[in-house]
Amino acid sequence: MEHEFWHERWAKDQIGFHEGTVNQYLHDHWPELAGNGTDAVFVPLCGKAHDMWWLHDRGHPIIGVELSEVACKDFFEEAQEKASVHPGEPFTTFRHDDLQIWCGDYFQLVPDDLKHIRLVYDRAALIALPPEMRKSYVNHLTAIIPDDTRILLITLDYDSSEMQGPPFNVTDDEVFRLYGEDYEINQVLKRDMARDNPFAKRRGLRNGATESVFTLVKK
């Protein structure tokens, strides 16, 4: 999937994958992973997710990485918050207190960039990628985060003949194939999305969809 695909989606406001509110599963299940702590959080392929403000409001330093400059700017403008902008290579950094969005290619991150990270929140990264890119995404993620980093992962599964992603369908079995060798995986929720759910109706999912929530801890 080329960079231009995502730049075009953001430029044309074709962002049906964006949630305009805090994700309910984050709200419900984050304490299971993070407890009452305020460890630093990495949000890959973060877009302009409101979830980052929710995490920041609970004391977590945030590093998000996002390819689209439009998304980075919108994130702060829509919250009516100012960010300092620091151009650089391979990332331009948008900063507001200890909330940062790094604008650039996720695959350019190196371990030193995330050495202080202890938590990862992935609601829209794995499911944003087509099947042929997911192994590379996971391999890179597990290579750049510290070994004691814990992950909250949210996935979506549906009949792929009914809808063309993104978001793409990711089965529970695929999560275990991608992460199972190195991580203890706990599926904390699996819930069917009703056929009359606005997202399912908008995208033509006549058979609905299934959402899953996982916590991952290094073995």
UniProtKB/Swiss-Prot annotation:
InterPro entries: SAM-dependent_MTases_sf, Thiopur_S-MeTfrase_Se/Te_detox, Thiopurine_S-MeTrfase, TPMT
Signal peptide, first to last residue: none
Catalytic activity line of the entry: S-adenosyl-L-methionine + a thiopurine = S-adenosyl-L-homocysteine + a thiopurine S-methylether
UniProt KW keywords: Cytoplasm, Methyltransferase, S-adenosyl-L-methionine, Transferase
UniProt record, GO biological process: methylation; response to metal ion
Family: Belongs to the class I-like SAM-binding methyltransferase superfamily. TPMT family.
Protein name in the entry: Thiopurine S-methyltransferase
